[in-house]
């Protein structure tokens, strides 16, 4: 029986080494992505946990609002995934200006859409909330809660699209850290605004909504800083769009389809 020669053994060792290296790199990308998604979703879960110490109607009102906001988040995330693919493709071919263009076009169109959602839910949230409850008191609490959290929709969109940009560049850790910081802000402000702190009286469910909006705004601001800061920003060295409010139909078509 003929044994394997030195050359064959070397090839096998190299193949095993490459396989291990590839697996390690995949884990380094996937694990932060999973954690980032968990942290994004957990912002509402943390709020729910804190609201859980309040009255039953408060819990119910917050719960039915979360059903709507989570549905919208799935939409934002779906569009962002399309942007991530295109950004990664452009980055792989060295077209960093295109990366910035794709991100900014996606952000612009999503902000336009989210503005429509904000207006509708601010003035007529009862149309949608009525599907989940018929209790007048719960619906009133839910409508007032919704009127506050709609102001955080823009921050949520900015964070989602910024995550698409970072992940398209192969950086999955930065969005995870931003999401973790957002949750920390939500917890700190949540306890203070819900239950009160010192001379500050607790605002109950509306304190929870305010804390969530503050946390999402903080996260959005942090993302924008990391994208556009001088010298170290993700888009440093790239030229901005000539017209910010110009919509490139072909670019948007690729993202949304």
Residue ranges with predicted function:
Residues 71-74, 186-190, 220-224:
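Hydrophobic transmembrane alpha-helices of multi-pass small-molecule transporters
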Residues 48, 59-119, 156-175:
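Small-residue-rich hydrophobic transmembrane alpha-helices
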Residues 56-67, 142, 146, 209:
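Small-residue hotspots at the loop-to-helix junctions and early N-terminal turns
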Residues 33, 37, 48-49, 66, ...:
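Transmembrane alpha-helix boundary and packing residues in multipass membrane permease domains
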Residues 1-33, 87-154, 200-256:
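Short alpha-helical transmembrane segments in multi-pass integral membrane proteins
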Residues 42-61, 129-136, 192-203, 256:
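Helix-terminus/linker motif at the lipid-water interface of multi-pass membrane proteins
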Residues 23-42, 46, 68-75, 151, ...:
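Residue-level signal for short hydrophobic patches within transmembrane helices
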Residues 110, 165-192, 206-209, 213:
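Alpha-helical transmembrane segments of multi-pass membrane transporters/permeases
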């Amino acid at each position: 029986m003929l044994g394997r020669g030195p050359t064959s053994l070397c090839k096998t060792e190299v193949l095993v080494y490459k396989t291990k290296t590839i697996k390690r790199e995949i884990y380094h990308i996937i694990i932060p992505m999973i954690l980032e998604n968990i942290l994004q979703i957990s912002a509402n879960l943390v709020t729910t946990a804190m609201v859980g110490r309040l009255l039953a109607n408060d819990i119910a009102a917050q719960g039915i609002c979360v059903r709507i906001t989570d549905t919208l988040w799935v939409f934002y995330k779906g569009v962002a995934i399309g942007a991530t693919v295109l950004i990664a493709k452009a980055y792989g071919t060295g077209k960093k200006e295109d990366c910035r263009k794709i991100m900014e076009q996606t952000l612009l169109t999503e902000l336009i859409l989210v503005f429509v959602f904000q207006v509708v839910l601010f003035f007529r949230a009862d149309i949608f909330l009525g599907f989940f409850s018929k209790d007048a008191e719960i619906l009133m609490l839910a409508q007032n809660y919704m009127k506050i959290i709609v102001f955080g929709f823009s921050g949520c969109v900015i964070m989602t699209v910024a995550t698409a940009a970072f992940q398209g560049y192969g950086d999955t850790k930065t969005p995870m850290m931003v999401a973790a910081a957002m949750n920390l802000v939500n917890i700190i402000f949540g306890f203070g605004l819900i239950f009160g702190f010192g001379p500050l009286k607790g605002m109950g469910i509306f304190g929870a909504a305010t804390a969530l909006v503050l946390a999402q705004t903080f996260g959005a601001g942090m993302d924008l800083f990391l994208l556009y800061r001088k010298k170290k920003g993700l888009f440093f060295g790239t030229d901005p769009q000539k017209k910010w409010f110009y919509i490139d139909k072909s670019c948007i078509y690729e993202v949304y389809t």
